């Protein structure tokens, strides 16, 4: 297995090194080919390394900085004034070819702004998109993009998102022909605004994309399609609503299983099955959103992620780096555009 190096913004997120460093250590024990740059305050990071075995420790290099991007920093401010921040230095390691992917749980807007400026977009891609997974009834995750990187999009941008989402699904899930749909207010061809309708027409002209038409919100988790495309305004609200509903259902189920002797007894008897269902519904199981369309790999973790959830995001970054996702997107987009022009 070829060695991989990830650059980790160790100070990002609600808990900083208290979560990011132990999760990185878990990943190093899980992947023998993995190395880390841990970017952040050396003193804070080393608190979590004192008891670490030597074979793991030698695969870590600390890049010291005391500057951080705060959650209240506006993207433009962070771009201009946080040039020595842990987030920026981590992205620069990818730009300079020292790391194959960057991971941060920090300020999403700042991460997107810095990534776009430092890494640049791929040829043929106007804007990067934020993409993550939703659970589905058939247990195969559904990719949803954009999740907030672009609050409004033209039809060409939505088309590019569809291409990138399709390639991501191929790369991560090894799905050779992912089904792609546009999120809309109805499935009829006459429904939706001009941007969505025109994006649908572009996708219909692309034989390399398995475009299935429009999909409504009530079909998000049906597993009928593999990739769902929308603008960032719709996508962000959809994702946050889905996560809220999932947490509500998990809470209500856990609460209900503690009421009454016979209910508790039955719950113990079927505990493995219950835990499996709860795990599938838990948003932490799907932690890790990819900022795709860039010349390098950037993965965003939830700021509130615990150690297990953060490890999920690291694993996603590892998979994308192994599959060389940016190169796959670039090659596929070039091929698709050539098909359309011919």
UniProtKB/Swiss-Prot annotation:
Keyword terms of this UniProt record: Cytoplasm, Lipid biosynthesis, Lipid metabolism, Phospholipid biosynthesis, Phospholipid metabolism, Transferase
The reaction(s) this protein catalyses: a fatty acyl-[ACP] + phosphate = an acyl phosphate + holo-[ACP]
Main location: cytoplasm
Pathway, per record: Lipid metabolism; phospholipid metabolism
Compartments reported by the entry: Cytoplasm
Single Gene Ontology BP annotation: fatty acid biosynthetic process
Any Pfam family matching the protein: FA_synthesis
InterPro entries: FA_synthesis, Phospholipid_synth_PlsX-like
GO cellular component, one term: cytoplasm
Highest taxon in the source lineage: Bacteria
GO molecular function, one term: phosphate:acyl-[acyl carrier protein] acyltransferase activity
EC number assigned by the record: 2.3.1.274
Family: Belongs to the PlsX family.
Chain's role: Catalyzes the reversible formation of acyl-phosphate (acyl-PO(4)) from acyl-[acyl-carrier-protein] (acyl-ACP). This enzyme utilizes acyl-ACP as fatty acyl donor, but not acyl-CoA.
Subunit structure: Homodimer. Probably interacts with PlsY.
Matches recorded under HAMAP family: PlsX (MF_00019)
Protein name according to UniProt: Phosphate acyltransferase
Record lineage: Bacteria, Pseudomonadati, Pseudomonadota, Gammaproteobacteria, Alteromonadales
